[in-house]
Amino acid sequence: MCSEVTQHLTEDIIPFWKSLRDDENGGYTGFVGYDLKADRKAVKGCILNSRITWFFANAYTLLKDSSLLEEAAHGFAFLRDVCWDRTNGGVYWSVNHDKTPAETLKHTYNQAFSIYALSSYYEASGDREALDLAYQLYDIIEGRMRDGSGYREAFDEAFNEIGNDKLSENGVMASRTMNTL
């Protein structure tokens, strides 16, 4: 079974995600239709790019294929250079295909996924900059998103609390949910 899973990973899953790489604008394509056609001009979710970066970093750690580390480095560069808010800190919700911010809100869930990506990339590559950014996000979560009762979830780009409607598919809006840290 292990060889079957490894074969599926290396012959199907990894090539699929590699095919979504955007060398022109960075990161990975934000939308693929049911027909598997990528929309290269779609908005790019920073969570999606964090997850893809995490995936390639961990795939490299497992398989030791240098092309996987290069994919993780590509994702890391996109998180650092495009998704990162250089004025207020933290990671945007999404960016346009042309590298401009699409939705500038900051969500605790999104910051946490970026920590996963950055720490996994650091573990795979030894790139200290990734670890430093992960620590910066941790400090943001603890310093700006936490209050005396726990963690608030949704903020504008300057970390003023806003309505939390990003993770609810059923219309339930709450300042705290179980879908965070």
What residues fall within each predicted segment?
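Glycan-recognition and catalytic cores of secretory/periplasmic carbohydrate-active enzymes
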Residues: 1-181
